[in-house]
Amino acid sequence: GVAGTGKTLLALAGALEQRNKFDQIILARPIVALSNRDLGFLPGDAEEKVNPYMQPLWDNLKFIQSQFGENERKHRIIDELKEQDKITICPLAYIRGRSLSNVIFIIDEAQNLTPHEVKTIITRAGENCKIILTGDVRQIDTPYLDEQSNGLSYVIDRLRGKDLYCHVTLEKGERSELANLANQHL
């Protein structure tokens, strides 16, 4: 779906709703800056380096949290899940060799991945693993990918009609009228 349709928000809300069926919710995004213009070296450990790229995921979790009063259990659950590493981030650079069982794995901005990278990610799925790819093929920041050659389009094309696969396209922008105007005219 286009920018502002709620792709990431709905993936996170769905994962939180199903959290009791899984041991962990893992969040990831490709480390690709807007227009592939990086800020350069970032200090810190792996988590500190990827946190700026993960901020949209944290922003969406914060938005979900804001829908409940601070004293409500649903508000506190997100903080508790993060503290217990039940919601965690995973740099995609370290995914090879892992076997992900009993997890929901959300990969945001999957249009910035290559078909090979998407295959590598999906083949990490162990038993009781749900993988959710979100993205918009019109928002590609990786210079050598386009609407047809990116990993998200590849998955949609290759897995359409398979039993373990589902694809949803969100069409109505919900972020703001300005975001909708930009989607339609820019």
Protein language model annotation of sequence segments:
Residues D108:
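Walker B catalytic carboxylates
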Residues G1-I104, N112-L186:
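Conserved helicase motor core of SF1/SF2 NTP-dependent helicases
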